[in-house]
Each structure stands twice: as structure tokens, then as C-alpha cells.
Amino acid sequence: MNLVFIDQLINHFNWTGDTAYVRQMWPLLVRHLDWEKRNFDVDGDGLYDSYAAIWASDALQYSGGGVTHSSAYNYRSNKVAAQLAKIVGADGSKYEAEATKILNAINQQLWMRHKGWYAEYKDLLGNKLLHESAALWTIYHAIDEGIADPFQAYQSLQYVNNFIPHIPILAKGLKDSSLYTLSTTNWQPYTWSLNNVALPELLHTALAFWQGGDKEEAYRLWKSSLMESMYLGASPGNIQQLSFYDAIRGELYRDFADPIGMAGRTL
């Protein structure tokens, strides 16, 4: 999960403006980007494979294909590396070139113009088919990492509205009937980490709605998610990992770090 840590590190740089720490961590960033390119873009097409990269990775693999969410992570990391290179006195041109290459590859090969959202991934072998049923993590990473332009973001969020299962949140004494939650994918059959009702995924999707300009839907999903976890859950005030509405596991864990982080970002 180097990708996620590096993304966190970039956010830290942006938040603090600590250029001394940028210089200290620059060698790590260089090694990380070299490692990503060497292992996950072996064919050099600008699309990156994903292996043990995100929360859902337990049962998630792409057999060497080009993946939207991992390519988006690498786009931002290279884009920012090109900017940070000026601070540390390094040549950032190769990182700028790689970011451009990634963005072009995503738009040419993974963005489905006829549908209006990103494919989950593209097969490495055979007919190099696109897997068109994107997960939540594909949509929100595309928006959060900056590969989606405003119209692509709008269209991708309509995919969430229209193709990701919506589950009403209902409870005795709960008067607000507008609350709902989402499953992470529309994939079948059910298996762990591939089709869950997971609070960090919901909060990151709410953030994507805010970033995409739909503040009303963002707040409704955010409120729904926190109400279901902190008020309706088995442990008052808890920030859970999985929801009561998860089909197999049900409510899971107490004050899990992933949703705590996303609750902080959305707040």
C-alpha cells in the first residue's frame, strides 16, 4: 500500500508547507516512483497494475492489467514530484512527462466516452477487454487524484447514482426517510472485500460528490453514513469499518482507522 502512504505524504506536504521535510523525504519519493514503474507498468503504456494497493485489496487483483485507481494514484504522485523537484533542486521533467503519459493513457484507454465513466481496468492479455462495472474506489480515486475534468467527474458521479446499489437506512423512530447507504460495487457473487457496505468507501464517495460539485448529495451520503454508524450502530459514537447492512459480515470493528481518516477529510 505504498501508493496510499505516498498520497498521504503529499497531502502532508501540501498542508504544512514543510520544505525541510520535503527534502528529507525526496529520496523515498524517487525510490517509490521507480519501484511503481518497474513493477506495475512493465509494458510502459502508462497504465499501472494494482496489487495490494488499496483497502479492498484482500480479494482484489487485476492479473497485470491497466487499472484506473492505481494509475490515478501514480498520476498525482508523478505530477507532484515534478513540482517538488524544483524545491529540492532536481530535474522533474521525467515525472512531468510520466504524469502526462498516464493521463493520456487513462483518457484514451480507460475512459468510456460512450458510457460516461471509467472502466475498472483493461485486461493485459487476450482481447484486452475493458471491465466496465467500476467500483466506488474507481470513481472517487479518479476525482480525488485529479484525473477527471469537471464534466468527467459529473458523469462518473451519475454512474454512482444510477448503477451502484442504494440501500435505504431505516430504523424505528428514525423520521428521516431520505438516508441511504451504498455497496462498494455491483459485482456478483458476493465475496469479502469486493462487495461490501464499508464506511471508509462511503465517506470517500461523499468527498467525491463534494469535489464534483454536488454538495447536496455529498452531505446526504455523509450524514447517512455517520448516522448509520455512530447513532444506529451497536456501539454509540463508533466509527465502524463495515455496516449493519453488509450482507454477510454485518457491523464490524470499533473506531477503524480508515473511516476515521476519511471522516476527518470530509469534515
Model region roles, listed by residue range:
Residues 1, 5-6, 119-159, 191-267:
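C-terminal capping/lid segments that line or modulate ligand- or cofactor-binding pockets
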Residues 1-4, 34-98, 104, 109-144, ...:
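The feature captures the catalytic groove of carbohydrate-active enzymes
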Residues 8, 12-16, 22:
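Hydrophobic or amphipathic alpha-helical targeting/insertion segments
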Residues 15, 84-87, 215, 228:
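Alpha-solenoid helical repeat scaffolds
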Residues 21-24, 94, 264:
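Alpha-helix N-cap and loop-to-helix initiation/capping positions
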Residues 25-45, 98-117, 149-178, 215-234:
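Long, well-ordered core segments of solenoidal/helical folds
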Residues 170, 174-183, 243-252:
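Charged, glycine/proline-rich intrinsically disordered loops and linkers
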